[in-house]
């Protein structure tokens, strides 16, 4: 057996061919983490192909020095190649994120349970390959994730690890087996009902995934700032296409990219918690004599059942002139229009 290896070397995005010793053959698979000799140095790397058709003769190949552990799946290798090309980066950075933090030589038992698909609009959306879930501002992630997880193994990506821990605990309480990334990488690779974590978990290993969910897909923390600068949304779409999983984006304020991708596959959740109303008040509408606040703001503030937030111009920014004593706004003596003070102190 011979393999193609991508070395874990900064600045190098080239693959090299190696022979596999007979003792290592049972352990080697696409994505396996190995150690090889390169330019008289011992370096780590990932197996990207087995028995490639254009390999040179085995007699001219150096042997792999060591099998280090189980690494990203073959599907992750393919997805990483596509994303790296799309965002003008190197695969090494992605495969490092997709690899376990500690070496894994063997996987635990598969802990997946049977799936019980339910009805409703989410079931229809799942059968169509997923879509956009337009939720309320404070939508509880657990409720929606439970509904989606009943269709099969689920990968959920949330903006913050704190949120991931909370949801993981609640999903375990609901009877699902859960892998919290990155600590439970080995269990995720073996098989669980729910895999959940922050941005990097979008590269988590999956066994026969049914759904991939990106929660709060509009959140900027789901953008990778290091090269390649991928977005979790793009990776989820790519991996869903490669695995046949349904892809869901959940957000109270969906991004234009998510709306365009959904193409009408939109489900509005039953959460009634929506954004509060925003009003822009023209201070001149109250007439020539006004105070620092409009009459509409004062009326709303008197209602003790409401919480009102007022955003006003900071001192020194407003260019209108108001009398300090009578609060009259300076107006043109001919047409009664409001006047502003220019930089040379003229009206």
Region annotations inferred by a language model:
Residues 1-291, 299-316, 326:
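Accessory, non-ATPase domains that flank or precede helicase/AAA+ motor cores in DNA-metabolism machines
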Residues 313-347:
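Conserved helicase/translocase motor-coupling segment
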């Amino acid at each position: 057996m011979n393999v193609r290896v991508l070395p874990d070397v900064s600045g190098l995005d080239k693959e090299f061919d190696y022979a596999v010793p007979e003792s290592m053959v049972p352990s080697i698979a696409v994505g396996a983490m190995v150690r090889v000799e390169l330019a008289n140095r011992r370096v780590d790397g990932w197996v990207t192909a087995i028995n490639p058709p254009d390999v040179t003769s085995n007699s001219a190949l150096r042997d792999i020095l060591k099998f280090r552990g189980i690494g990203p799946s073959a599907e992750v290798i393919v997805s990483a190649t596509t994303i790296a090309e799309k965002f003008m980066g190197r695969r090494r950075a992605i495969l490092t994120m997709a690899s376990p933090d500690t070496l894994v030589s063997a996987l635990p038992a598969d802990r997946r349970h049977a799936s019980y698909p339910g009805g409703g609009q989410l079931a229809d959306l799942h059968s169509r390959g997923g879509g956009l879930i337009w939720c309320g501002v404070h939508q509880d992630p657990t409720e929606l994730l439970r509904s989606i997880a009943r269709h099969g193994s689920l990968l959920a990506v949330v903006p913050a690890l704190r949120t991931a821990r909370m949801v993981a605990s609640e999903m375990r309480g609901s009877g699902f087996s859960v892998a919290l990334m990155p600590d439970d990488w080995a269990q995720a690779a073996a098989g669980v009902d729910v895999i959940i974590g922050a941005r990097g978990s979008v590269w988590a290993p999956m066994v026969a995934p049914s759904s991939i969910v990106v929660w709060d897909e509009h959140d900027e923390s789901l953008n990778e700032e290091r090269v390649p600068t991928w977005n979790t949304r793009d990776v989820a779409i790519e991996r869903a296409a490669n695995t046949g999983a349904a892809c869901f984006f959940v957000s109270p304020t969906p991004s234009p990219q998510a709306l365009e991708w959904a193409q009408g596959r939109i489900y509005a959740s039953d959460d009634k918690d929506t954004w509060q109303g925003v009003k822009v008040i023209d201070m001149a509408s109250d007439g020539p004599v006004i105070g620092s606040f409009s009459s509409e703001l004062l009326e709303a503030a008197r209602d003790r059942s409401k919480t009102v937030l007022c955003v006003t111009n900071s001192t020194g920014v407003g260019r209108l002139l108001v009398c300090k004593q009578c609060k009259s706004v300076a107006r043109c003596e001919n047409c009664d229009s409001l006047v502003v003070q220019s930089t040379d102190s003229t009206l």
